[in-house]
UniProtKB/Swiss-Prot annotation:
The lineage of its organism: Eukaryota, Viridiplantae, Streptophyta, Embryophyta, Tracheophyta. Residues 63-211 are annotated as: Disordered. Its EC number is 2.1.1.-. It comes from the Eukaryota. This is Probable methyltransferase PMT28. It comes from Arabidopsis thaliana. Residues 1-22 are cytoplasmic. PANTHER family: METHYLTRANSFERASE PMT28-RELATED (PTHR10108:SF1102), SAM-DEPENDENT METHYLTRANSFERASE (PTHR10108). Residues 141-173 have a biased composition (Acidic residues).
Length: 724
């Protein structure tokens, strides 16, 4: 039986062998295909592993500036790859490292890897910039760090990556879009957008290859068709179709979805060169700021008069019903420790009115920046800018102001109309965040309601502010209260009720870009390595003082020496700029504030902008007694058109190559910010400056100077009155 089965089996296989060979070819092909699949799968798995190792190794590069940065960096170890976008600092899983001195920003939920890459101390071989004889290595290293950061940000970045142009907004970037300004849910929408991006989507992003500006692009300019016309502020004005049926301005900053590529028109009656400083303190050209509601406002107030073609500002007529100098002296009499221009150098003034307070302090070497509230439909902030006073426009509602913690020596509110005790006191807690320990909060008002007074007293007591004085100034008839923030954390432990509570240790007090306000108290810095732990030196000594918490002192000193030499040898004499007509200046990529510091002796003020994706050096800029602000240049800036006489951009475009959808929109924004007759000075790679020059020519700017050496260059251009 067994023998028969064996014979049958042999016969069966013999028949199979005689069948066509096609089936064997197919089986062989399937086996080979399977082996190829296994090979490629193992290859891809290896690549992913290598990528992870490479990202984790960035921690070796990071070098925090202060211990505040260091401790927060440790907290951020648990951050996830899929976390991105604009952060709510209250969430432990979303909050990253503190940005005390100059580590990378943590305004958004970025990963620890990004923190490491964007640090300025990473070095690699790149062409050495030689635009001038004096070259600073810090500038190179900062640029290299930004380049490395951009490379990685496309794989992990959220709204600051390659699709970072105004994600917060709702219109189409031309003033024609559809808007549903549901302001109460703005921050919720931001979170939803952040969650939509998966790990797979992030990993698909790659570094943009090729030039920053599209060489094939042809620009056909047109005027913006917006509700606010010649005063268009893209992220503040509500210009969508639906928005026009609602409020005039957004409750919170909300930018167009698409890059703004239209040009803001000139005022209805044209624009003439502004009155030069210091004459502009007392008068400006009315046509440059003409506004229907401003015309009605002028008729009701005596501190501003229409005199022919000018608006004049009588020195003896102020909102203080008397001499503002008396008001300042009254404050010093109540609190002798306040020494204007010495221990008090940097002041934030809430709201814009007649700017007499700002002007009087300027004469005492006090630099005051005014917060023009978005509800100011009279546009008094624009009047202040035209007069030459530091001003920016923002809402004061639910998001933090774009400043680091503990940087203002004094905050002033004179009849500013802010209800500090409302919404759980979060507005006052925001002032507590940005006020320097031991700093002063001055509150002046004409009519105090008993209910408001009681609520304010309870709130200030709950956050342990000490009321130093409460008197009525006779000349102005204003009740003046002066509070002082604690200098240590001991007093917080003595509170019977821990409400508001102390903020969590992992919450970053310096995170400010699209970050909601918190109803908690941040602890006072106590270690010498933390920024804000000690009061700065008196002015002007603080300008050249490098605090203990600054770990890159040598680089900061090199930066200062570099820009002093550059400004004195080139900028003041070699560019053809008439500095007698320059007052409002912006440094679009401030590092240590060296460029602004070099202009201190000139009759100018400088807004030092620290991009939110770059190392956070803004606390040090304030420590020096200079002004600054956080900003993302993929979005329009928070100010009126024609605000600045000079824009300075040092390697701005090369650092934003992989962050902004359309870098040309930054040039459009520069055109919006600059006054006719104003200047831009751009230092960057030659491959960037050449197409940039063509874009400026298409905007009918006058190219006054170009300079190139090796791969680096400089471009100096002046804006004209041309509009399409």
């Amino acid at each position: 039986m067994m023998e028969r089965k064996r014979e049958m089996g042999i016969a069966y296989f013999a028949r199979r062998i005689k069948q066509p060979r096609g089936i064997w070819v197919k089986m062989t092909f399937i086996v080979v295909l399977g082996l190829c699949f296994v090979f490629f799968w193992s290859f891809l798995s290896s690549s992913a592993s290598t990528f992870n190792v490479q990202r984790e190794s960035f921690d070796d590069i990071a070098e925090p500036v202060s211990s505040r940065t260091k401790s927060a960096h440790e907290v951020s170890e648990s951050s996830k790859l899929h976390e991105r976008g604009k952060v709510e600092s209250g969430s432990k899983s979303k909050e990253g490292k503190k940005v005390g001195g100059s580590s990378v920003h943590k305004h958004e939920t970025k990963k620890k890897k990004e923190h490491a890459v964007s640090h300025p101390h990473k070095k690699k071989d790149v062409p050495k910039p030689v635009v001038e004889e004096v070259v600073v290595k810090e500038d190179q290293e900062h640029e290299e760090a930004e380049s490395d950061d951009s490379d990685q940000s496309n794989k992990e970045d959220g709204e600051e990556g390659t699709e970072s142009d105004g994600n917060e907004g709702e219109s189409d970037g031309n003033g024609d879009g559809s808007v549903d300004d549901s302001s109460a849910s703005v921050d919720e929408e931001v979170e939803e957008k952040n969650e939509e991006v998966t790990v797979n989507e992030i990993s698909k992003k790659r570094k943009r290859k090729g030039p920053v500006f599209d060489p094939k692009a042809e620009y056909s300019w047109r005027l913006c068709n917006t509700r606010s016309k010649h005063n268009y502020m893209p992220c503040i004005d509500n210009d969508g179709l639906i928005g026009r049926l609602q409020s005039y301005r957004h409750r919170e900053r909300s930018c167009p979805k698409k890059p703004v590529m239209c040009l803001v028109p000139l005022p209805h009656d044209g624009y003439d060169p502004p009155v030069s400083w210091p004459e502009s303190k007392s008068k400006i050209l009315y046509k440059n700021v003409a506004h229907p509601k401003l015309a009605a406002y002028i008729k009701k107030h005596n501190w501003v008069n229409e005199t022919g073609e000018y608006l004049s500002f009588p020195q003896n007529q102020t909102t203080f019903n008397g001499n503002v100098l008396q008001y300042l002296e009254f404050i010093q009499e109540m609190v002798p420790d306040i020494e204007w221009g010495k221990n008090v150098r940097i002041v934030l003034d809430i709201g814009c009115s007649d700017s007499s307070f700002v002007a009087a302090l300027l004469d005492k070497d006090v630099l005051t920046v005014s917060l023009g509230l978005k509800d100011d439909l009279v546009d008094l902030a624009q009047v202040a800018l035209e007069r030459g006073f530091p001003t920016f426009v923002s809402s004061l509602a639910s998001r933090r102001l774009p400043f680091p913690s503990g940087v203002f020596d004094t905050i002033h509110c004179a009849a500013c109309g802010v209800h500090w005790h409302s919404h759980g006191g979060k507005l006052l807690l925001e002032m507590n965040r940005i006020l320097r320990p031991n700093g002063y909060f001055i509150l002046s008002s004409n009519n105090d309601k008993i209910e408001d007074d009681e609520a304010m007293t309870a709130l200030t007591a709950s956050i342990c502010w000490n009321i130093l004085a409460h008197k009525t100034e006779e000349a102005s008839e204003m009740g003046v209260r002066i509070y002082q923030k604690p200098e240590s954390n001991d007093i917080y432990e003595l509170r019977r009720k821990k409400n508001p509570p102390l903020c969590e240790d992992n919450e970053n007090p310096d995170a400010a870009w699209y970050v909601p306000m918190k109803t908690c108290i941040y602890e006072i810095p106590s270690a010498i390595e933390q920024h804000g732990a000690e009061w700065p030196e008196e002015w002007p000594k603080r300008l050249e003082t490098y605090p203990e918490w600054l770990t890159s002192k040598e680089k900061a000193m090199e930066d200062t020496n570099h820009w002093n030499a550059m400004v004195n040898k080139s900028y003041l004499t070699g560019l053809g700029i008439d500095w007698l007509h320059i007052r409002n200046v912006m440094d679009m990529t401030a590092i240590y504030g060296g460029f602004g510091a070099s202009l201190v002796k000139q009759n100018v003020w400088v807004m030092n902008v620290v991009p939110v994706h770059s190392p956070d050096t803004l606390p040090f800029i304030y420590e020096r007694g200079l002004l600054g602000i956080y900003h993302d240049w993929c979005e329009p800036f928070g100010t009126y058109p024609r605000s600045y006489d000079l824009l300075h951009a040092d390697h701005l475009f090369s650092r934003l190559k992989n962050r902004c959808k359309q870098p040309a929109s930054i040039v459009v924004e520069m055109d919006r910010l600059t006054r006719p007759g104003g200047w831009v000075v751009v230092r960057d790679k030659v491959e960037i400056l050449e197409p940039l020059e063509e874009i400026l020519r298409s905007l009918h700017w006058e190219i006054r100077m170009t300079y190139a050496q090796d791969k680096e260059g400089m471009l100096c251009a002046q804006k004209t009155l041309w509009r399409p």
